[in-house]
Each structure stands twice: as structure tokens, then as C-alpha cells.
From Swiss-Prot:
One of its GO terms (molecular function) is tryptophanase activity. This is Tryptophanase. Pathway: Amino-acid degradation; L-tryptophan degradation via pyruvate pathway; indole and pyruvate from L-tryptophan: step 1/1. The lineage of its organism: Bacteria, Pseudomonadati, Pseudomonadota, Gammaproteobacteria, Pasteurellales. Its EC number is 4.1.99.1. It catalyses: L-tryptophan + H2O = indole + pyruvate + NH4(+).
Length: 471
């Protein structure tokens, strides 16, 4: 099949979920009732749901079959050992704690690493700073509620939608080391490497950059946590783009990548393809004390450490999903689907971030230049897209980034993006064509789209539950 321009989806669809069509007037009323926040829409009112790829896609028949092997023992479950063995085989990590999802892992490891730095290095909580190539929203939120200032150290081209680069998710290594020296290494309890870098547009991090980042971290004795939601997509980009890895398998690249971290926190609802599940894992005995502390917190916050909020069948399914998500043909199809959508949008004059993994990212700032950042152009675009076509998407910009917890001022955002997140094995090329057609209509009316202001604003992670109105 090497000579075909477009290959169909590499799977057969056996089970379907009917969706209903609605009228424009119905959708206008629905988004108004939802406070101009697509998160607050009912799913039955959504025709194409591009809010997230987290737990919203299809599962493989092997994953579904694995559910039947579930051992529901409260402690020492056979299914836990199946999962822990998969982690050791894929990532090379010795210690595994299952969690209900990624934020379950974050609420455990973040306070433990802060406490450890305080006890061993004399961390001053009033000066505490944590670094990342870009923090995912919940990782940022958990860091902030534990008193840390978050600092994203990304490359200058990361958010420039006019520039293409192979690894726009990379750390700016110079800024990272300068930042550590500025605040004092003792005041940096951890560094988070986010793969792929969601907020920059699903952009990958190169192995060379991971290796150099890890060398800096070890120089200052700072633990590195790999935020691993899209580990397989990142490995695919390394294989396709980074010199020297073309002949490596996805499994080999993944194993190599995790040499450059001390722990991993994962929402398994993305590349591991499960509807619910997460992981918190530690590399070796150098992190055994942290692992033991996290096990204790897991009992209080998630469940016994050998189930962590997951039933036995779910752990079996996750063990299979970790492997299924690394299939070469699957990843090629998935990334090509994103490229098809981005190329189609660019062809009608809708500027997008360079195609990355899991989503197309529309540059709302360029499509709606009349709306200032503090009136959330990408959120306004999301509402208009829903009105036009019943498509639910998510803002990745000033609305999501939020305010400085110390000053209360809006944090400056490097780009105002609308994320069109593609659930796995759920939508076909026909759906992509429909999305492109919807944007044609949105673009024709772009100058009439209004900015938004708050009617209700939560203090933390406001984008999930805030309510807004048109200015």
C-alpha cells in the first residue's frame, strides 16, 4: 500500500454511538445556558466532540477482552502485577502506583517532592519555583496550590505559528539553567518534562533535548518527572524527525526517553487509550523513599497502592493499552489525520500551529485580531464554532492560563490557540472535511464575533467551570 496518497483508517468499526443533529437556534441557546463555556455543555448537544482526547476514544478488542481477566482483590491484585510488569518492560521503571487519572498522580507526588526538598536541601517555600517546557493545566494548578511559582522555559519558536521546527516542544536549556541559578537550586523541588508539549500545540521534545535537560537537572540534584500522557506520539516524532532514530522502533525510543527522568506521571486516558486511569512510577532505588511516601498518600487520596482507584479489569486493560498505543501503523494514521485537518484549514486561510500530535491548534489571535487577549479570542472562537456546526473545541490561551496567584493579574500568554482535539479511532476523514467546512463559515463571519468577560470566575483552574458573557 506504499503508492496510495491517502490510506483509510487501519481498523474496522464494530460498535457505533448515534449522535443527533441540532438547529442553530438550539445551539445558540445551549451555549448561552452553558455560560459561553463549552466545558459546561451536555454531550448530547454536541455533534462532533473535539474537547479532549482524554478517555474519549475507542478501545481495541484486546483491551476490551483484557477486562475479563480482572482480579478485584483489594490488595496484591494479580492485575496490579500485570500492570507493573508492563511499566517495567516499556519504561524500565521499578515502582508503580496506579491512580484514577493523571491529576491523581500529581496530587500525590508534588507535595512529597516539595517536602523532600525542604528537608534535604533547605527549600524556602516563599522562593519556590518549578520549571517545565510547559506545564499542563492541572500540573500547574497542583504546583500552585502547593505554593510553587511555575515557570515555563520554552524555545522562541514554540508558539510562533509562522515558523515550522521539528521539535517545538523542547526546553530552552539556557533559560532553564539560568532560572535554576537565579532562584537557587535548593528552591527547585522538581522539573517537569511534558511530552508531547500540549500547550504549544502537541509539539514533540527531542531525545537530545531531554538528555541535555536531564544533565542540567542532575548537575543541581533536581528530580525530573516526565508528564507522559502522549509518550507514544512523542516517540513517533523522534523516529520520524530526529537524526539517528529512523531505524529504531517506537518501543526502543520510548525506553530510551525514560532514561532521562526519575519518575513519570501519566494520564493514561491519552496514548494508553483507556477511558479512565493514570500512573505514578519511579525509576529505581534512588527514588524509593519518594515512592514509599507516595504510597502512603495514595492510600488516603486514591486507594490501596495496588489498585489506586482502578478496578482490576481496568488495570488489565491499561497494561494492554500501553502496548497497543505504540503500534507503528496506528501512530502513522493518527498523526496523518492531524496533518490532513491542519492542511485543510490552512488551505482556506485559517492559520494553525505546525501539525503536532493529538490535535489541530488554530491561531485564534490571527483569525480574530480585533479581540484583545483579556477578552479571550480563542474562547470566543470556540463558542462561534459550536453555534455554526455543533463542534465542541477547547481554548488553549489566556483563559486557560489564568491569573498570577500572588498578584491576581492575568498571566501573559504567548499565543491564543483553539485546540481541535481528535479522539482516537473515533472520527473519520469525512468528519475532518466537515470541520474544515465549518471553519469556512466561521471565517466569513469572523469580524462580527465578540469578545467575552466573566460572570463567574473560580480561583483555580477557572477554564473548567467559569461562566462568561459577550462584551
Amino acid at each position: 500500500m506504499e503508492n496510495f496518497k491517502h490510506l483509510p483508517e487501519p481498523f474496522r468499526i464494530r460498535v457505533i454511538e448515534p449522535v443527533r443533529r441540532t438547529t442553530r437556534s438550539y445551539r445558540e441557546e445551549a451555549i448561552l445556558k452553558a455560560g459561553m463555556n463549552p466545558f459546561l455543555l451536555d454531550s448530547e448537544d454536541v455533534f462532533i466532540d473535539l474537547l479532549t482526547d482524554s478517555g474519549t476514544g475507542a478501545v481495541t478488542q484486546e483491551m476490551q477482552a483484557a477486562m475479563l481477566r480482572g482480579d478485584e482483590a483489594y490488595s496484591g491484585s494479580r492485575s496490579y502485577h500485570a500492570l507493573a510488569n508492563a511499566v517495567k518492560e516499556i519504561f524500565g521503571y521499578e515502582y508503580t502506583i496506579p491512580t484514577h487519572q493523571g491529576r491523581g498522580a500529581e496530587q500525590i507526588y508534588i507535595p512529597v517532592l516539595i517536602k523532600k526538598r525542604e528537608q534535604e536541601k533547605g527549600l524556602d517555600r516563599s522562593k519556590m519555583v518549578v520549571f517545565s517546557n510547559y506545564f499542563f493545566d492541572t500540573t500547574q494548578g497542583h504546583s500552585q496550590i502547593n505554593g510553587a511559582t511555575v515557570r515555563n522555559v520554552y524555545t522562541k519558536e514554540a508558539f510562533d505559528t509562522s515558523v515550522n521546527a521539528d521539535f517545538k516542544g523542547d526546553f530552552d536549556l539556557e533559560k532553564l539553567e539560568q532560572g535554576i541559578q537565579e532562584v537557587g537550586a535548593e528552591n527547585v523541588p522538581y522539573i517537569v518534562c511534558t511530552i508531547t508539549c500540549n500547550s504549544a500545540g502537541g509539539q514533540p521534545v527531542s531525545l537530545a533535548n531531554m538528555r541535555a535537560m536531564y544533565e542540567i537537572a542532575k548537575k543541581y540534584d533536581i528530580p525530573v518527572v516526565m508528564d507522559s500522557a502522549r509518550f507514544a506520539e512523542n516517540a513517533y516524532f523522534i523516529q520520524q524527525r530526529e537524526p539517528g532514530y529512523k531505524e529504531w522502533t517506537i518501543e526502543q525510543i520510548t525506553y530510551e526517553s525514560y532514561k532521562y527522568a526519575d519518575a513519570l506521571a501519566m494520564s493514561a486516558k491519552k496514548d494508553a487509550m483507556v477511558p479512565m486511569g493514570g500512573l505514578l512510577c519511579f525509576k529505581d532505588k534512588s527514588m524509593e523513599d519518594v515512592y514509599n511516601e507516595c504510597r502512603t498518600l495514595c492510600v488516603v487520596q486514591e486507594g490501596f497502592p495496588t489498585y489506586g482507584g482502578l478496578e482490576g479489569g481496568a488495570m488489565e486493560r491499561l497494561a494492554v493499552g500501553l502496548r497497543d498505543g505504540m503500534r507503528q501503523d496506528w501512530l502513522a494514521y493518527r498523526i496523518n489525520q492531524i496533518e490532513y485537518l491542519v492542511n485543510g484549514l490552512e488551505a482556506i486561510g485559517v492559520v494553525c500551529q505546525q501539525p503536532g500530535g493529538h490535535a489541530a491548534f488554530v491561531d485564534a489571535g490571527k483569525l480574530l485580531p480585533h479581540i484583545p487577549a483579556d477578552q479571550f479570542p480563542a474562547q470566543a472562537l470556540a463558542c462561534e464554532l459550536y453555534k455554526v456546526a455543533g463542534i465542541r473545541a477547547v481554548e488553549i490561551g489566556s483563559f486557560l492560563l489564568g491569573r498570577d496567584p500572588k498578584t491576581g493579574k492575568q498571566l501573559p500568554c504567548p499565543a491564543e490557540l483553539l485546540r481541535l482535539t481528535i479522539p482516537r479511532a473515533t472520527y473519520t476523514q469525512t468528519h475532518m472535511d466537515f470541520i474544515i467546512e465549518a471553519f469556512k463559515q466561521v471565517k466569513e463571519n469572523a469580524e462580527n464575533i465578540k469578545g467575552l468577560t466573566f460572570t463567574y470566575e473560580p480561583k483555580v483552574l477557572r477554564h473548567f467551570t467559569a461562566r462568561l458573557k459577550e462584551v
